[in-house]
Curated annotation (Swiss-Prot):
This is Glutaminase. NCBIfam families: Gln_ase, PRK00971.1-1, PRK00971.1-2. Homotetramer. One of its GO terms (molecular function) is glutaminase activity. The gene is glsA. SUPFAM superfamilies: beta-lactamase/transpeptidase-like (SSF56601).
């Protein structure tokens, strides 16, 4: 079965009672102000059709979903061995901002989707781009077809002000020799990436290349190679949902990436990209209602990579 607007609307109605059972991210004050009742879903097919329901066109802070975009950009700029000598490809099994593992493993983060790994990717981008912040914004605008995408400067400033742990992670990696640039500018770029404001429709369009062997459905142009697409989807399937990646694979069965803003993207290779948004999070930092919505959608349309 193919997704329809009615199926999406029905799914949102089914998951709405879950609102109130999760917790909006409050350690970033600007995120704590987002109404917990927001709920949206969008599907973008490889034929270029948008199917949506709920608050699918309202922009929100994508947070760690940006890590998939940053890694894609780094893969366009570096040979693979230059990236993977500095960050691993394994699930961490730890909280996304844990430092214990990083210390034990000599400053090499487990994967590019936990904070330490994403900060290494931000460092890589800083080394190759004269204006990494502008380049990432242009990348998001180009892939989504939405020229109105911006950074939420209030969120970025809020994260920088409350970002001591991320700064500690960066300095710890630098002490092990796994850092090339000044820490503060890299952190500023990292926090801005997390503060990208996009809607479910924007996100589904942006990541369409992951469902289409590396070619953006929105632009018709190659973003990465088919091999790199396979690699990205493998990392998303194993590491994309913090320490809830196994649970997500079990329930949803798609490569995905979440953010503490309540967004999740999911990929059905060869067919479609999906984005959901509900700000309340579960214990792993993933959208509670959003995960359930994706689980129901996977069941209804009979899709899974497994």
């Amino acid at each position: 079965m193919k997704p329809t607007a009615q199926i999406l609307t029905d799914i949102l109605a089914e998951v709405r009672p879950l609102i109130g059972q999760g917790k909006v991210a409050d350690y970033i004050p600007a995120l704590a102000k987002v109404p917990n009742t927001k709920l949206g879903i969008a599907v973008y097919t490889n034929e270029g059709e948008v199917i949506k329901a709920g608050d699918a066109e309202e922009s929100f802070s994508i947070q760690s979903i940006s890590k998939a975009l940053s890694l894609t950009l780094a893969m366009c700029l570096y040979k693979q061995e230059e990236i993977w000598c500095r960050v691993g490809k394994e699930p961490s099994g730890q909280a996304f901002n844990s430092m214990i593992q990083l210390e034990m493993e000599q400053g090499i983060p487990r994967n590019p989707f936990i904070n330490a790994g994403a900060i290494v990717v931000a460092d890589l981008l800083q080394s190759r781009l004269s204006a990494p912040r502008q380049r990432l914004l242009e990348f998001a605008r180009q892939l989504s077809g939405d020229t109105h995408i911006v950074y939420d400067k209030v969120v970025a400033a809020s994260e920088m002000m409350h970002g001591d742990r991320n700064a500690a992670i960066a300095y710890l990696m630098r002490s092990f020799g796994n850092f090339e640039n000044e820490v503060i500018p890299v952190l500023q770029n990292y926090f801005h990436a997390c503060a990208l404001k996009m809607s479910c429709v924007d996100l589904a369009k942006t990541f369409s290349y992951l469902a289409n062997k590396g070619t953006s459905v929105q632009t018709g142009k190659p973003v990465v190679s088919p091999t790199q697409t396979k690699q990205l989807n493998a990392l998303l399937a194993t590491c994309g949902l913090y320490d809830g990646a196994g649970e997500f694979a079990y329930r949803v069965g798609m490569p995905g990436k979440s953010g503490v803003g309540g967004g999740i993207i999911a990929v059905v290779p060869g067919e479609m990209t999906i984005a959901v948004w509900s700000p309340e999070l579960d214990a792993s930092g993933n959208s509670l209602a959003g995960t359930k919505a994706l689980e129901l959608l996977a069941e209804r349309i009979g899709r899974s990579i497994f």
